[in-house]
């Protein structure tokens, strides 16, 4: 069990070896209180007894009214993990499995065959719940060819298979616009926690409302899918912006000498709105140093917390750290992100298994699919409640608005600020070389992740003739592998002494094996074998395991690495850019695969495109330098804070609008000049 700091007076601290010239009761013996630094590449120390010591230098002092500088607690981390447990089931089970099938089936029951445009595609059948052997046999048999079906929406003929694709395209577009409209405002005021929770509850309710949707109102199902997918994306983007805050105020970052990567905040302090007192900080520092004399680091990568203080070393001796080791913040961020992804995958696995049982019980009926979506929405709703209770708001600095501003004008001000902030964020990202490189690689990588997944499912269904139960089993295997990957990649990278960038490169290399394996089917020797190169159904299962294992590593490492590169205080804006890059890229890959399929009449030629798409991010990631990116991000944050302060002071003193415009022009010019060296 991970030790926690006892109450003040409950333990006898380790008494350090006396230094030369000191006596046992010397008042000048020093107690180490590690300071919080930007990079934590060295553990600077300061004496409590030193006259220059200031409590505010040891604990982050509030930079604005309402800032929450309390240490990250176990309860707060649990709230962050809990939302992954709640919402990951929607994207894995809903978006990845049941919503596309449900939308297609709802449209099919209203469509006609493309061949004659008069014969109904499918007549409704009664619901007969059963667990008979024939039910399982029907699910495992390849589905017979039903023919292409079309429906008419607003006088336009649309293929039922394309109905779900168009629905998600619309939802992605709305999602991007919504994220832009409120992302900048999420960094200001007390809305950083409230907005994502509102989106979470609305999205979960929209998912549950699939239950009463019958084929006659299939367009309502499309509307619900758009609402739920839009709300999911918006809520996840905003909650991702909590990750740098949780890391920044984590005790192992504030007190790097500690050997236990857990919160030292007692249950009473978790509910206290005040920052820790000087007495508490001194007490926690003694406990941290006391632990460092007794035991090794708990559950930390070996190259991050190696060389803790020896048992008889003075407490003022700095901890030696290899120059090649990643920072404490990045190691912790990767660990939290990995745990969050893995916890979400475990929940998705449970709900996916539950959904398969429900579908089998109702013999793949329309009602069974809608019931599964109701369960997914209910799961999302219920487990979002602990997140709302445990995750602290940690509000950002408020916007400078007049005290009597109406709610409408306040909302309009936040809306306009968000769009302006995105434009500034894009400009800032252009000035940050490593952020720009990472986003370019992530654009291609995210597109390849979405395209490979959709292409594989379509290939398995149409070319290999796999049934819905077989496809669901592939999803289960991929989810299990994702859980394993999320927990394993951090330990593999530590064991092999890999940097985060090198770990991502390893994931990309393994990912490239999937399309290359599909291209083996073109070799005549492999064709004569009759297997390998995706010629048999069973070959999809190991590829699904590779896909999930790789995705578990990419999901956690990419998110945490990006959090290290962005400026502090602008997390929501930069994570909005991250999400827009993610969502926007997913439009191109599937469209190109569809065009290739239409041109050659089969999907296998699309593997050539996938091999190129997956491989392109590899050389780009080679140029990403985390240390350089962290330094440039910190420098940009300081410059932006300085310019913001100067501008606010000048705006107050300005007498007319023209002076303000001139000032804005000067501020932009100063920003460009300050970072001109980055473009040389």
Swiss-Prot record:
SUPFAM superfamilies: MFS general substrate transporter. It is a multi-pass membrane protein. It is found in: Vacuole membrane. GO terms for cellular component: vacuolar membrane. The keyword Transmembrane helix applies. Residues 662-671 have a biased composition (Basic and acidic residues). Gene3D superfamilies: MFS general substrate transporter like domains. The gene is ATG22-2. Keywords: Amino-acid transport, Autophagy, Glycoprotein, Membrane, Transmembrane, Transmembrane helix, Transport, Vacuole. GO terms for biological process: amino acid transmembrane export from vacuole; autophagy. Residues 1-69, 257-279, 653-680 are annotated as: Disordered. The lineage of its organism: Eukaryota, Fungi, Dikarya, Ascomycota, Pezizomycotina. Belongs to the ATG22 family. Glycans are attached at residues 303, 662. This is Autophagy-related protein 22-2. It holds the Pfam family ATG22. Vacuolar effluxer which mediate the efflux of amino acids resulting from autophagic degradation. The release of autophagic amino acids allows the maintenance of protein synthesis and viability during nitrogen starvation.
